[in-house]
Amino acid sequence: MGRKKKKQLKPWCWYCNRDFDDEKILIQHQKAKHFKCHICHKKLYTGPGLAIHCMQVHKETIDAVPNAIPGRTDIELEIYGMEGIPEKDMDERRRLLEQKTQESQKKKQQDDSDEYDDDESAASTSFQPQPVQPQQGYIPPMAQPGLPPVPGAPGMPPGIPPLMPGVPPLMPGMPPVMPGMPPGLHHQRKYTQSFCGENIMMPMGGMMPPGPGIPPLMPGMPPGMPPPVPRPGIPPMTQAQAVSAPGILNRPPAPTAAVPAPQPPVTKPLFPSAGQMGTPVTSSSTASSNSESLSASSKALFPSTAQAQAAVQGPVGTDFKPLNSTPAATTTEPPKPTFPAYTQSTASTTSTTNSTAAKPAASITSKPATLTTTSATSKLIHPDEDISLEERRAQLPKYQRNLPRPGQTPIGNPPVGPIGGMMPPQPGLPQQQAMRPPMPPHGQYGGHHQGMPGYLPGAMPPYGQGPPMVPPYQGGPPRPPMGMRPPVMSQGGRY
């Protein structure tokens, strides 16, 4: 048999026991670290060459290889890369490498076995939930007609689902159903929670039980819908009809306002801004009954938009004003809002009708709502929401002008104020038309337009007719701006 070939060793430096990937890199390392002259920094190839260089050039004797580990500083050994290394050192190197490889393999196998054992232990010791043991003293649940029994809750009283971890069980002697609830909703009730010594049944979904005066939910209704309005003549269910049960601290019944039989109670709307838009204001004969029903109604969800407008019965004219001759009665004693700064006390509009055309009547502005504060120096005043600040400012006396009504012709030229076209207000006429263009005097630039009876230049045309189409300069030449004198025209047409 042939001799077994020795395994080629990885390049390594005999002087410092450092491994390298390539022998060329090893040679460069030896020239830079071990065979370099410390005087002239010349890189030599072997240890004996370094010693000869230092003796001949620098007249110095070197007896050890620089940067070498102890025991391998022999300067007489001629080592170039992997060549020249003693055989015993090569064998020792092989033995150390084999020992290192065996140790690494053993460690790797041990790590793999540990991971496998950990996986097996984790799989074997899986989490098993403990079964819920039924409490003593309870009877098995009875099946309700039309509803399947609750699965996974043996030994629990009827109407209670299985308790979650960390929730205390029910106290004995406590009824599972609220008084006044229908029997079909037993399984929709959750456990009780104790607040300040009072036990309150909490329905599923986080809803509070119905308060006094509100009927309970019917079977099949979603929880978000409002309760049905009872018919006239049937009083709603109140707190007095609830049956007191032993073991529960009953709250005292809240005082409810007396609601007359023919008037249905006003329920809280889902959208108060849209709910009160269609709330009609009745006549003065039923104002007292409305005040009682409004005082018994609940507060609105959004007080900023609630009570913003109140619709008035009767037809509406062309100028969006009511045509009824008698003013509508306003509601008295409205419910106190939560935020009085965003609401108004009362707002009513009165109008008068005319046989030919409806004239805009002056709206009766109510007293601005004030917010009473604790400080004596601050006082907030909020104006009417129906009238803007510009309209309120336009009603001041200095902005009022008096114009003759359509159908009345002024006699002679009206007086002209210091500013052209602006007349001072007269106390005889109502100050309701604030911003109108100035009307030229009658007869100054011509009379009435042909074919348009009753039309005055500069005034409002009759209803249903537009202003007459007058070509330029037919109704009169354009006026110069105020403060400028018109130029004098000569006969030739030049200045």
From Swiss-Prot:
The gene is Znf207. GO terms for molecular function: heparin binding; microtubule binding; zinc ion binding. It comes from the Eukaryota. Residues 283-292, 326-372 have a biased composition (Low complexity). Kinetochore- and microtubule-binding protein that plays a key role in spindle assembly. ZNF207/BuGZ is mainly composed of disordered low-complexity regions and undergoes phase transition or coacervation to form temperature-dependent liquid droplets. Coacervation promotes microtubule bundling and concentrates tubulin, promoting microtubule polymerization and assembly of spindle and spindle matrix by concentrating its building blocks. Also acts as a regulator of mitotic chromosome alignment by mediating the stability and kinetochore loading of BUB3. InterPro entries: Znf_C2H2_type. Mainly composed of disordered low-complexity regions outside of the C2H2-type zinc fingers. Coacervation depends on hydrophobic and aromatic Phe and Tyr in the disordered low-complexity region, that may promote coacervation by forming intermolecular hydrophobic interactions. This is BUB3-interacting and GLEBS motif-containing protein ZNF207. It comes from Mus musculus (Mouse). Residues 376-408 are annotated as: GLEBS. Keywords: Cell cycle, Cell division, Centromere, Chromosome, Chromosome partition, Cytoplasm, Cytoskeleton, Kinetochore, Metal-binding, Microtubule, Mitosis, Nucleus, Repeat, Zinc, Zinc-finger. Residues 1-92 are annotated as: Microtubule-binding region.
